[in-house]
A protein has these predicted regions:
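Conserved small/polar residues in nucleotide/adenosyl-binding loops
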Residues: 139-141
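A well-ordered secondary-structure block
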Residues: 129-135
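Sec/Tat signal peptide C-region and signal peptidase I cleavage site
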Residues: 16-20
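Sec-dependent N-terminal signal peptides
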Residues: 4-14
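Active-site-proximal alpha-helix that buttresses catalytic centers in soluble enzyme cores
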Residues: 21-121, 130
């Protein structure tokens, strides 16, 4: 439940105006550390990937737009400007996710268990993903 709240808070903090007291409270909680923050990826126009995409070839995938790159920079700046500790950044193998992580946080690792189960091609990963995410939250928080 804490993870879901943090995801929603980060999303709201980056996308809508909120009153100053609420924003300070959010930032204060994030500055304490010990949070698992999930960011899918910045803006990549469209939906899904082409049927014949290759996880190892960015040219076959839906990628960040210039707006998405700017959004990634803003995400990174939010964390830097507010001294929010980052212990570890992990990305899926999708190019749009890796690019978001690179622009926002510079250093990141990839893990295939974070790969989307959006398409039928990867739907079998869902149970494993949920288990590994739970394990990850227990280890790193």
């Amino acid at each position: 439940m804490k993870l879901l709240k943090i995801i929603i808070i980060i999303f709201l903090a980056l996308t809508i105006e909120i009153n100053a007291d609420t924003e300070k409270e959010i930032i204060n909680n994030l500055q304490k550390g010990g949070n698992l923050i999930f960011i899918r990826h910045a803006y990549a126009p469209g939906n899904g990937d082409p049927e014949n995409f290759d996880i190892n070839n960015c040219e076959t995938q839906r990628n960040l737009s210039q707006s998405g790159r700017l959004q990634s920079k803003k995400i990174g700046n939010f964390f830097k400007e507010n001294d929010i500790p980052i212990k570890l950044v992990i990305s899926s193998e999708w190019c749009r996710c890796k690019e978001t992580a690179l622009i926002a946080f510079k250093n990141y690792e990839t893990e295939n268990f974070l790969n989307s189960f959006y398409s039928a091609k990867f739907a079998k990963n869902r149970k494993m993903q949920m288990k590994k995410l739970k394990d990850l939250s227990l280890i790193h928080i």
